[in-house]
C-alpha cells in the first residue's frame, strides 16, 4: 500500500461525522485506483530521468565528463573554466535531451544540438 493510500484510509476512518463502512470502502477503492493511475502517469519516462544516476548514464553514453561536459580521454582532467560548447553539453547531461528539445533551449549547430537530435532519433526508433 502506498503511503498516500494509507493517509486517505486514515482520513476516511477518523472523519467526523463517522461514515458507514460500505461508503468508506467504496470511496477508498475509487480513489485508490485513480491515484494509482496518476502515479503511473507521473513516473519518469525513458530519457527524461533527473536523478544523479540518470545523469551519469547520459554522460557515459555521450562519452562526456559528468562534471565539466568535455570529451573523455585517457588523461582527462577537468578544467576550471569550461567552454560554451562544453557547458551546453553539460546542460544536456544534467537536464535531459527531451526537456531541452521541447523548450528549444539549445544553440543551433552546436554539439549539444547534435546530442539532442541523436537522442530524439533514438527515442523515435524505440517508439517511446
Swiss-Prot record:
Q: Which Pfam families match?
A: Viral_NABP
Spell out the molecular function terms from Gene Ontology: DNA binding; zinc ion binding
Alphabetically ordered keywords of this record: DNA-binding, Metal-binding, Zinc, Zinc-finger
Tell me which InterPro entries the record gives. Viral_NABP (IPR008891)
Q: Zinc finger (C4-type) locations?
A: 65-94
* Role: May act as a regulatory factor during viral transcription.
What protein name is recorded for this chain?
14.7 kDa protein
Lineage, uppermost ranks: Viruses, Riboviria, Orthornavirae, Kitrinoviricota, Alsuviricetes
